[in-house]
Amino acid sequence: MSEEQFGGDGAAAAATAAVGGSAGEQEGAMVAAAAQGPAAAAGSGSGGGGSAAGGTEGGSAEAEGAKIDASKNEEDEGHSNSSPRHTEAAAAQREEWKMFIGGLSWDTTKKDLKDYFSKFGEVVDCTLKLDPITGRSRGFGFVLFKESESVDKVMDQKEHKLNGKVIDPKRAKAMKTKEPVKKIFVGGLSPDTPEEKIREYFGGFGEVESIELPMDNKTNKRRGFCFITFKEEEPVKKIMEKKYHNVGLSKCEIKVAMSKEQYQQQQQWGSRGGFAGRARGRGGGPSQNWNQGYSNYWNQGYGNYGYNSQGYGGYGGYDYTGYNNYYGYGDYSNQQSGYGKVSRRGGHQNSYKPY
């Protein structure tokens, strides 16, 4: 059973990193605008199978709620070749026509979904999200109406039932854009490594904007790590293709560095692919409290070189906690079924992919 999805979904997002996804790449993801209603609890028992492992999961999770193809509407409105400003306005308008539908039965088909919601207005398109491993429904999908008034009609109805299940329709809106990641953390660096040597090595990947060499407050000596900021995001992507880099005489571990705001945003939307996959927690390495006294960066696990399971600002552990709750829509994808629950497993994610 292959996943039913829209023809234009693939153009909705570009490949990049999870947590460090660039602004344009993250505009496609959607979050629920309304709080969970009673129907969510009622529908939670009907959901779909578990998520995919490794890179497959990263791509699927990252694209959940991606922009539904509304090319027909764009052509009708004359937006197909419009300016970027008009394109953004059209995209914002289309958000008013979309709905997230949770609590679906595993037996619900795309036709069932379209037939049910067509009584509220013309349905331009709809999709069901399927588990890429089992091919079974994950218990949620998306509906795109031709007019926003249809969404209002759906929301005005107190309860919705489809295939014997109480379902949970919600308005959907675009996720907030994310800042591009231009800064990296370099761990395991010898305090004796000259700044010129650091700049020379990392300058080979792209133009370095600044290098931060934190000092130990007690000894007034350099500590065993640094932060490097680049002019662009591309050098960070290149560097993150390898976990370890030899800088001078040191074998250094590289991780994406996030500000407190970026970290909180990443936690809000859940761990995702790209950079995250390359910083998976594991054992080993000397124990150094690197992050102590360096409060400009949220506690991302830099201080624990023992690689705890939740270290590195949500990069470790690989449990997809943000994805389990599906951006606030409720847990429709990780539910027990007659087939049993498909366990979530860690894995290497190489890029951000559309579903």
UniProtKB/Swiss-Prot annotation:
The modification Dimethylated arginine is found at R345. One of its GO terms (cellular component) is synapse. Identified in a IGF2BP1-dependent mRNP granule complex containing untranslated mRNAs. Part of a complex associated with the FOS mCRD domain and consisting of PABPC1, PAIP1, CSDE1/UNR and SYNCRIP. Interacts with IGF2BP2. Interacts with GTPBP1. Interacts with EIF4G1; the interaction requires RNA. Interacts with EIF3B and RPS3. Methylated by PRMT1, in an insulin-dependent manner. The PRMT1-mediated methylation regulates its phosphorylation. Arg-345 is dimethylated, probably to asymmetric dimethylarginine. The modification N-acetylserine is found at S2. The keyword Nucleus applies. GO terms for molecular function: chromatin binding; histone deacetylase binding; minor groove of adenine-thymine-rich DNA binding; mRNA 3'-UTR AU-rich region binding; RNA binding; telomeric DNA binding. It comes from Mus musculus. The modification N6-acetyllysine is found at K165, K243, K251. The modification Asymmetric dimethylarginine is found at R345. This is Heterogeneous nuclear ribonucleoprotein D0. The modification Phosphothreonine is found at T127, T193. Residues 44-58 have a biased composition (Gly residues). There is a cross-link at K72, K129, K197 (Glycyl lysine isopeptide (Lys-Gly) (interchain with G-Cter in SUMO2)). The modification Phosphoserine is found at S71, S80, S82, S83, S190, S271. GO terms for biological process: 3'-UTR-mediated mRNA destabilization; cellular response to amino acid stimulus; cellular response to estradiol stimulus; cellular response to nitric oxide; cellular response to putrescine; cerebellum development; circadian regulation of translation; CRD-mediated mRNA stabilization. Residues 11-43 have a biased composition (Low complexity). Binds with high affinity to RNA molecules that contain AU-rich elements (AREs) found within the 3'-UTR of many proto-oncogenes and cytokine mRNAs. Also binds to double- and single-stranded DNA sequences in a specific manner and functions a transcription factor. Each of the RNA-binding domains specifically can bind solely to a single-stranded non-monotonous 5'-UUAG-3' sequence and also weaker to the single-stranded 5'-TTAGGG-3' telomeric DNA repeat. Binds RNA oligonucleotides with 5'-UUAGGG-3' repeats more tightly than the telomeric single-stranded DNA 5'-TTAGGG-3' repeats. Residues 97-179, 182-261 form the RRM domain. SMART domains: RRM. It is found in: Nucleus; Cytoplasm. The gene is Hnrnpd. Residues 1-91 are annotated as: Disordered.
